[in-house]
Amino acid sequence: MTLKPMIRTTLRFAVALSALAMAFASTPSAAQTQGCNVVVQSDDALRYLPHAIEVPRTCKDFTVTLTHSGRLPVLAMGHNWVLSKQSDMAGVARTGMLAGAENHYVDPSDRRVIAHTKVIGGGQASSVSFAVSALQPGETYAFFCTFAGHSPVMQGSLVLQ
């Protein structure tokens, strides 16, 4: 390999690495809440942004608005936002699958579910509010999608501040 192609390859690598670093640097690790509200973004790539939410204990109620910026319809790539204790996540996801689409993949009688949105498709949004008093200091909470097979990769954490 001569010097010019090596320099060109090195420059391409450096540009790609810089772009990747900037993408991760601009991804928030914890949600910047607007008072007692947060917008959680989802898309066709099976992810939530942000991955972590901090709920101020001064809020009486907290509202989560789930948006889906993807293009696929609800039947192909639907998402919801479900909140439970971290320790209950697997069980809630399992019973949610059995509850089916007509129940937005959430068992309506499951007391482990603290809050959940409807299942939405590309271009849609859904909101849910819950009492902050339902959260316990020091407890670990998870939010996740209970649409078919999404919960193993589509999840995040929520803490009471």
Give residue ranges: language-model regions.
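Short, solvent-exposed loop/turn elements at domain surfaces
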Residues: L46-P50, L72-A76, A90-V92
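C-terminal segment of classical bacterial N-terminal signal peptides
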Residues: L20-S29
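Extracellular/periplasmic metallocenter environments
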Residues: A115-Q161
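N-terminal edge beta-strand
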Residues: Q34-D61
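Short beta-strand and strand-turn-strand segments in soluble, beta-rich domains
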Residues: N103-A115
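Beta-strand cores of secreted/periplasmic/IMS beta-sandwich domains, seen most often
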Residues: A52-A76, W81-L83, S127-Q136, T140-Y141, ...
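Bacterial N-terminal signal peptides that target proteins for export
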Residues: T2-A16
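Extracytoplasmic/periplasmic copper-protein system
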Residues: Q32-D43, S84-V106, A148-Q161
